[in-house]
Amino acid sequence: WEGLYAYTRSVHLSDKPLERINPRQGTPEPSDPGIDRTPKLFIGGKQTRADSGYSYPIFSRDGKQMGLVGQGNRKDIRNAVEAANSARSWAKSTAHLRAQILYYLGENLSIRADEFARRISEMTGQDSKESKEEVKLSIERLFTYAGWADKYDGAVHGAPIRGVALAMKEPVGTIGIICPDALPLLGLISLIAPALSMGNTCVVVPSEPFPLSATDLYQVFETSDLPSGVVNLVTARHGEVIESLSGHMDLDAVWYFGSSGLSATVEKLS
C-alpha cells in the first residue's frame, strides 16, 4: 500500500469497501460464420487471440449484447508478463519521453471522448453526464501524471562520513494490476498512468463486468507511440486468473482493487 500511495499521491481515500458487480445477463447473438470477429487481447503491442480460443459476451443494462471479449487464461497471463519484462527498457527512457507519450495518450483519448462516454453509458447504465465526467477525469489523469513524470526526483542526505548520500527513486519493475469493477475507464487509467509515469511496465486485467472500455483503448495505445509490451491487457474472469497473476514470480508488485475475499488471496500469493 505504501508504494501504491506514493505513486498515485492519494489525498482523499474512502473507507467504504469495494463491492463486486456481477456481469449483466442477456441473450447472446448468433455470430456470422463468414466473418472472423475473434475478440482479442493486447499483448506485446499487438492484438492477439486468447489462448483458450473462447470469448464471453458483454451485455448492456437492458440485456442487449454489446460485444464479445477474449477469455484470457494462465498462459495469456504468462505471455503478458514475458512481454512486459521484455519492455523494461521503458525504465531507462527519459522522463521527458514518458511525459510526451502520456500526453499523447490523453490527446488521442480526448479525440474519441464522446465515443467512450456513449460506450460507458450503454455498459454501466450511467447517465450521459456521469459518463462524460468519467472520460474527462481519465484524460485529466493522463495529463496529470505526464506532468509528474520528471518530478519523481531524488534527494541528497547528509552522511556520518565525509560526503553525501544521494537517494534516487527507481521504477518497481513489472506491475500486475487488477482493476475495480466500477468506473471501467477511470479505474484503469488511474492505475496505469502513475505506473507508466515512473517507468514501470504493466500487465492489466480490466473490469470484469465492463471490459469494453479497455478493449476500445487498444487503438489508442497503438496510435500513441507507446512501446510494445509496456502495457498488456488481458480480459478475463477475475477469479480465473487472479492466482496466476498474483503468484507469478516475475512480477515485482501487484495492485488489486476488489472484494475482500480475493484481496486475501492476492496478499497470500504475492
Enumerate the language-model features and the residues they cover:
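C-terminal segments
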Residues: W1-G34, K129, K136, E140-A155, ...
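N-terminal glycine-rich, Lys/His-bearing helix-loop that initiates the first secondary-structure elements
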Residues: H12-Q65
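A generic structural motif
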Residues: A50, Y54-S55, G70-N73, P209
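Glycine-rich loop-to-alpha-helix module at the N-terminal edge of alpha/beta enzyme cores
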Residues: G63-Y152
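Short beta->alpha linker loops
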Residues: G72, M123, E133-L137, E208-L212, ...
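Conserved small-residue-rich beta-alpha loop and adjacent elements
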Residues: G147, K151-P227
